[in-house]
A protein has these predicted regions:
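N-terminal secretory signal peptides that target proteins for export/translocation
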Residues: 1-11
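Sec-dependent N-terminal signal peptides
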Residues: 9-24
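Compositional signal for N-terminal targeting/processing segments
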Residues: 17, 30-340
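Hydrophobic alpha-helical membrane-insertion segments, chiefly the h-region
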Residues: 22-32
Length: 340
């Protein structure tokens, strides 16, 4: 993905998350040189999910995500790039004493396939210089964006390393970089899915997969998907190859700073979430098979995550006027509260 001006024409922007540069919040986007239309894509069947009605707070969500491995082999945990809340949650998951008992693999967007040996050495506890470790994310396709320069990504690797230091060698967690580095000609999502298949599913293992939330959407406008070529979404690709084995979780809420000049047709009314929830604790995880959350509008609550700038009229959400609901997008969501 790359930064692009909102003045760009005839492109779509795939918003993966946010980052901060010199104190200015920016939206990470990707350029797609294909047409956009409102037709909807076929929805892969979502497997039934047994979840508590509400899992409140970081620790409560972490426990529920770990318990989800009793039902699924893959927990796909979407993030908003650079957000501290997402970092705190995934670190809480890997530090939980039950995580390493059930899960031995993690696949991340912020590591390249070509620096796997470096990442392995660091996660095992070997002495690796900062300059060497930085190559793990600096050799990804997204390095030019600066999105991985946030310290939260190195902190995640450090957290897994610390967990492994307390475990016997045969019980340690391995972290895989899923982004194709230099010399790896595969597309981003093809590479990620290949890593999950070869290193986890074909070995009858389980994995936590951490990528920008848009990679885990189970449904998108049809013509948007056609513009992406083979990269139709990691969760979709895994569901097609291994039905019922992936649990997709996406973030909703919190601030979203759009590119200059971009406005959304519908602003999210987070009071709908707040009225429907029993707990006042944020963040909170809820199932997207549960009413009323499953019926909330995708355009309203995640419409700012994927934009198109094709044609006249400026940039707009690819979900504009879409009938898609949140229940068609993922299996569960982590609600961070209102956007203020």
């Amino acid at each position: 993905m790359s930064f692009t001006s909102v003045a760009a024409q005839n492109v779509s922007l795939r918003v993966i998350g946010m980052m901060t540069v010199a104190g200015v919040a920016m939206v990470t986007v990707g350029v797609i040189n294909e047409p956009f239309a409102k037709a909807q894509s076929p929805k892969p069947a979502s497997p039934p999910v047994r979840l508590p009605d509400e899992s409140a707070g970081i620790e409560g969500i972490a426990r529920t995500l770990i318990a989800a491995f009793d039902q699924f082999d893959i927990v796909a945990l979407g993030e908003a790039h650079g957000r501290q809340l997402d970092s705190d949650l995934r670190i809480a998951v890997v530090r939980h004493p039950d995580f390493a008992k059930n899960v031995r693999s993690i696949v991340v967007e912020f590591g390249s396939t070509t620096e796997q040996s470096t990442l392995d050495r660091y996660i095992r506890g070997e002495n690796i210089s900062s300059a060497q470790l930085e190559q793990v994310w600096k050799t990804t396709t997204q390095a030019a964006n600066g999105v991985w320069e946030s310290p939260i990504y190195a902190e995640f690797f450090a957290a897994v390393r610390e967990v492994n230091a307390k475990l016997p060698a045969d019980a340690r967690v391995r972290v895989f970089g899923g982004d194709p580095g230099p010399g790896d000609s595969r597309s981003r999502e093809i590479a990620a899915v290949a890593v999950v298949k070869e290193q986890v599913l074909e070995k009858r293992g389980k994995a936590l997969v951490i990528y920008g939330a848009a990679h885990f959407y189970r449904n998108m406008p049809r013509d948007y998907l056609s513009s992406m070529g083979a990269d139709i979404g990691i969760a979709r690709m895994l569901e097609m190859a291994y039905p019922g084995r992936t649990f997709a979780v996406i973030p909703v809420g919190g601030p979203l700073d759009l590119p200059p000049g971009v406005t959304l047709r519908i602003q999210p009314d987070y009071r709908k979430f707040d009225r429907a929830l029993q707990t006042q604790v944020r963040p909170v995880l809820v199932s997207l098979q549960r009413s009323p959350f499953r019926d909330f509008s995708t355009e309203e609550f995640i419409g700012g995550q994927v934009l198109t700038c094709r044609g006249t009229g400026g940039c707009r959400s690819v979900f504009q006027s879409s009938p898609l609901t949140l229940g068609q997008m993922a299996d569960a969501l982590v609600y961070a509260g209102g956007g203020s």
